[in-house]
């Protein structure tokens, strides 16, 4: 940490804590995610770092480097000063159709890039979309802990993600197309932006995970009468929320949908800067970038733990995301204190 000044905490979760830091050499701000050394440095952590390393897109949080401290593995990445999109919806209640489309276009742009890089995210949700804090409020996808690369890994079949956002086929415990499952999660994100509630929660018992899963499997959702959205938007949602993944709309098809094509073009932040030094800066960054071999070596060092001990706190809820294969048909919320935030339920009044 000799190169960084720690400024303040950004948040915490089961993974550990995130801090805002400033690089001493150039004054640049970064976010650093600290994960305790030991068994918490699992396959999800390694996958997150390796997959994230190769992604360079204006709508994806940029990875910088990883290193170890005596007690933690530290992942350094771009700092998004605008916070979570989740928080903005909590404050607004819900977005207008134009505002929802503005963010949805950016989400799809980032997801399309990931898919072109043969990476499916598998845990797309509002809490994993950040805002850069600029006047234009650009969206940034983060947290690749459950992502899977078809280049490095087989077709996904594990049941991972956040319950409210999970596609029906993900619950089947069979192999599925992670890219098409991502489309479903994007649809849930769009619905929440426009409605201010989750599409498949039981309004009578929103914390009942079994009811949510049943409603997902039966594609049971409605758009409340008080929400005014266009027929084109409703049509897009109906093409996303399709139980059969083979019949679900794809990302390229979404990009051609009439509703998606409406509204102004979203200018990427790199184009807004018009900085002649950007290319040189990126070339220099590429020269200094850690290799996969270096990263794996650092991760192996972090797995050793502190003084030969492991720091595994158990795996269940990770920032609201779960591996349902680890839970034997149990109500996952039994393991969470009532006062803790539960993804799958808004914790603020909408």
Swiss-Prot record:
State the UniProt keywords alphabetically: ATP-binding, Coiled coil, Kinase, Nucleotide-binding, Serine/threonine-protein kinase, Transferase
Q: Which CDD domains does its entry note?
A: STKc_SnRK2
| Pfam families given in the database record | Pkinase
- Which residues hold ATP? 10-18, 33
Q: Which residues cross the membrane?
A: none
Q: Which organism is it from?
A: Arabidopsis thaliana
Is the Lipid biosynthesis keyword given for this protein? no
Task: Give the induction annotation.
Answer: By abscisic acid (ABA), salt, and osmotic stress (at protein level).
Q: Its catalytic activity?
A: L-seryl-[protein] + ATP = O-phospho-L-seryl-[protein] + ADP + H(+); L-threonyl-[protein] + ATP = O-phospho-L-threonyl-[protein] + ADP + H(+)
- State the tissue distribution: Expressed in seedlings.
Any idea of its EC number? 2.7.11.1
One GO location term (cellular component): cytoplasm
Protein kinase domain location = 4-260
Sorted alphabetically, the Gene Ontology BP terms of this entry are: response to osmotic stress; response to salt stress
**What family classification does the UniProt entry report for this protein?**
Belongs to the protein kinase superfamily. Ser/Thr protein kinase family.
Q: Which residues form a coiled coil?
A: 270-303
GO molecular-function terms, A-Z: ATP binding; kinase activity; protein serine kinase activity; protein serine/threonine kinase activity
Q: Where is the active site?
A: 123
Q: Tell me the protein's name.
A: Serine/threonine-protein kinase SRK2F
